[in-house]
Amino acid sequence: MSTKRKRMFSKELKHMMYGFGDVREPLHESIDLLEELVFEFIQEMTLKAAQVSNKRGKFQTEDLVFLVRKDPKKYYRVIELLRMNEELKKAKKAFDETNVEEEENV
């Protein structure tokens, strides 16, 4: 591993590791290694997406979709997460509108 960084995803990775069959309390070294791999992956994808977006001048979600298009598992997961994000936005907007109407009626 390279330089020491603040752990950002340790808790989440620990739960994911357990969910995928690891022990409830995995070794700190295992979590650190996995976190380093995740961090490097995110860093690499962000750099590549920035390079793709430089051609247009603005970073967009589609740049990440473009990068994972040849990996079906990642591609369909990204598409699913984007759809869920849109559904959550719509639900939140509808909820906020309902609350505004209720406050006006009070």
UniProtKB/Swiss-Prot annotation:
**Source organism of the structure:** Dictyostelium discoideum (Social amoeba)
Q: Where in the cell is it found?
A: Nucleus
What family classification does the UniProt entry report for this protein?
Answer: Belongs to the TAF13 family.
Q: Which gene encodes it?
A: taf13
| Biological role stated in the UniProt entry | TFIID beta-specific TAFII.
Q: InterPro entries given for it?
A: Histone-fold, TFIID_TAF13
Q: Histone-fold domain: which residues?
A: 8-51
Write down what this protein is called. Answer: Transcription initiation factor TFIID subunit 13
Example of a GO biological process term:
transcription by RNA polymerase II
Instruction: Show the GO cellular component annotation of the record.
Output: nucleus; transcription factor TFIID complex
Sorted keywords for this record are:
Coiled coil, Nucleus, Transcription, Transcription regulation
SUBUNIT field: TFIID is composed of TATA binding protein (TBP) and a number of TBP-associated factors (TAFs).
Lineage of the species this protein comes from: Eukaryota, Amoebozoa, Evosea, Eumycetozoa, Dictyostelia
According to its UniProt record, where is this protein mainly located?
nucleus
Which GO molecular function entries does the Swiss-Prot or TrEMBL record give?
A: protein heterodimerization activity
The answer to keyword Coiled coil applying to this record is yes
Question: In this entry, which stretches build a coiled coil?
Answer: 77-106
